[in-house]
């Protein structure tokens, strides 16, 4: 019986021996298979929803204020508004025990490093609310000593407009709509994690865009004496 030897060309195309064909797999294949499972996917999603439900209904604010907007913030803790109904009445004196911080008032240049250090001392998960025109964009203080928006050095999650905003605006931003809705859609590791946490946060639609169609559809406007 005759045998024929065929030399394999490493640089050529070889159907039988694809020496140059390599597949790069990112991550653990077993873990990817588990996450692709319908049962495990639903179970993991249910665990995320349960953990986020606890987080969004027990938000502990860090207690500090910068200006007059802080007065409107603490007004929501009175019996008239009763922010305790939503589990956010536990004021923390230490940033290590707080879930979110509210920058309420005018942020001066000398105060910015202090606020940034307090934010870095907060443990994950943590959120930031910018309350009032001064915190959002500097307000009427277009001057060298005032930071033109705290988002220059902090990742802001929710902006509250107004000069100053009413307590109802603070409660709407914190509890009734914006921050709780954002926390409910987050996906972060459910176990101890060292290093990058891989947090997924859904994009929040601005209230101006969300209510644009409703406001444009209004044809009968109220008279000024009814406002």
From Swiss-Prot:
Its EC number is 7.1.1.-. It comes from the Bacteria. Gene3D superfamilies: 3.40.50.12280. It is a peripheral membrane protein. GO terms for biological process: aerobic respiration; electron transport coupled proton transport. It holds the Pfam family Oxidored_q6. The keyword Lipid metabolism does not apply. Binds 1 [4Fe-4S] cluster. [4Fe-4S] cluster binds at residues 68-69, 134, 163. Its main location: membrane. InterPro entries: NADH_UbQ_OxRdtase-like_20kDa, NADH_UQ_OxRdtase_20Kd_su. Belongs to the complex I 20 kDa subunit family. NDH-1 shuttles electrons from NADH, via FMN and iron-sulfur (Fe-S) centers, to quinones in the respiratory chain. The immediate electron acceptor for the enzyme in this species is believed to be ubiquinone. Couples the redox reaction to proton translocation (for every two electrons transferred, four hydrogen ions are translocated across the cytoplasmic membrane), and thus conserves the redox energy in a proton gradient. NCBIfam families: nuoB_fam, PRK06411.1. This is NADH-quinone oxidoreductase subunit B. It comes from Yersinia pseudotuberculosis serotype O:1b (strain IP 31758).
